[in-house]
Curated annotation (Swiss-Prot):
Function: Involved in the post-transcriptional modification of the uridine at the wobble position (U34) of tRNA(Lys), tRNA(Glu) and tRNA(Gln). Catalyzes the conversion of 2-thiouridine (S2U-RNA) to 2-selenouridine (Se2U-RNA). Acts in a two-step process involving geranylation of 2-thiouridine (S2U) to S-geranyl-2-thiouridine (geS2U) and subsequent selenation of the latter derivative to 2-selenouridine (Se2U) in the tRNA chain.
PANTHER family: TRNA 2-SELENOURIDINE SYNTHASE (PTHR30401:SF0)
Keyword Transferase: yes
Source superkingdom: Bacteria
Family: Belongs to the SelU family.
Record carries keyword Transferase: yes
InterPro entries given in the database record: Rhodanese-like_dom, Rhodanese-like_dom_sf, SelU
Protein name: tRNA 2-selenouridine synthase
Quaternary structure annotation from Swiss-Prot or TrEMBL: Monomer.
Name of the gene: selU
Length: 368
């Protein structure tokens, strides 16, 4: 039987091994931020926690504890113990925690023990583990050389990164493809969950034995997910690799990402009619989001072309007209913006090349 308390020195092992954790915080706390390997089985529901918190402020700790026991009692208490025991049966090596590793953790552990179930709780709870992960992100740029993968929109940076063991996929963690049209069907994680998942990915990367940390050249915001400032500053100072691709391939890749995959995803989720409506709204609203930068005239031109493409798609099952507005968007908006940004980092460019050439360059970098 392991010790009743899991020490802070084991945080790294918990995250690297995706150790199952029973999170006994209230649902509202879990929703704000949690770890990927945790399951929310609360000691108190939101309303119960709120009442106990109010009592604590007005009457002190002992009165709050007494109220908590009266709220979680009888059949309610038994149901929660059974839910915890069921989780532990399915995850025999599970740990538990609350926010600070205090009373809620101790009480849950005690009630389970009385039911014949032994579960260690984590020292410091969620708060201390979260602080540990923040430290991982802040320290990461000093652990390995940082390389930033740049390239024009549609050149396949994400596809390339997914083939490289040196890479951490920031857009995958943020569930957003980074561009104005980068929104996915499922929502992005909360900011806290984005940071938690980034830190765990960095921890896993540091144990992989690779020579560098390869990241896509991102803006501070990936959709609504903000990169931690210290980490972003390090990315801005990193050496740059430029992935190159032909315009024809870029166009086809963007049509596949913006049109084919998104349309299929919406239809699968919502059905054909509602799916097409949601898909159309996704395209048109993505365009609206860059209207100020495009200017009214150019926005209107792109919107008209986009609507023509949508009409042809729904009436003739033909997506070829989408290539027209995508091509215009590239050459009037994305490419000039990219070239301007690249000019500002030209002194840090180590290599430019195709997918194959870039793979070969990185393979040789690994052995230097």
């Amino acid at each position: 039987m392991p010790n009743a308390i899991v020490a802070a020195e084991q945080y790294r092992e918990i995250f690297l091994n995706q150790h199952p954790i029973m999170d006994v915080r209230a649902p509202i706390e879990f929703t704000r931020g949690a770890f990927p390997n945790s399951t929310n089985l609360p000691l108190m529901l939101d309303s119960e926690r709120e009442k106990v918190g109010t009592c604590y402020k007005q009457s002190g700790q002992q009165a709050a504890i007494a109220l908590g026991h009266s709220l979680v009692n009888g059949p309610i208490k038994q149901q929660r113990i059974e839910a915890w025991a069921s989780y532990v049966k399915a995850n025999p090596k599970a740990y538990l925690y609350c926010f600070r590793g205090g009373l809620r953790s101790q009480l849950t552990q005690q009630w389970l023990k009385e039911a014949g179930v032994e579960v260690p709780y984590i020292q410091g709870g969620y708060k201390a583990m979260r602080q540990y992960l923040i430290g991982v992100i802040e320290a990461a740029p000093a652990q390995q050389p940082l390389l930033s993968l740049s390239g024009m929109t549609g050149c396949g940076k994400t596809d390339f990164l997914l083939l490289r063991k040196e890479a951490v996929d920031l857009e995958g963690i943020a569930n957003h493809r980074g561009s104005s049209f980068g929104k996915n069907i499922d929502p992005q994680p909360t900011q806290i969950n984005f940071e938690n998942q980034l830190a765990i990915a960095l921890l896993q990367h540091q144990t992989s034995g690779v020579a560098c940390l390869l990241l896509e050249d991102e803006s501070f915001l990936i959709g609504r997910s903000a990169l931690p400032q210290t980490f972003y500053n390090a990315m801005q100072a990193a050496n740059v690799l430029v992935l190159e691709e032909s315009d024809d391939v870029r166009l086809e890749r963007l049509r596949d990402e913006y049109v084919h995959k998104m349309y299929s995803g919406f239809c699968e989720r919502l059905g054909a009619e509602a799916g097409f409506a949601a898909f159309s709204d996704y395209l048109l609203q993505s365009l609206v989001s860059i209207r100020k930068r495009l200017g009214g005239k150019q926005h209107q031109e792109l919107q008209d072309l986009m609507q023509q493409a949508l009409d042809q798609q729904i009436n003739q099952n033909d997506t070829s007209l989408h290539l027209v507005w995508i091509n215009l968007l590239l050459h009037k908006y994305y490419d000039p913006m990219y070239l301007y940004q690249l000019q500002n980092k030209s002194e840090r460019v180590l290599f430019k090349g195709s997918h194959q050439a870039m793979h070969e360059w990185l393979d040789s970098y690994q052995t230097r």
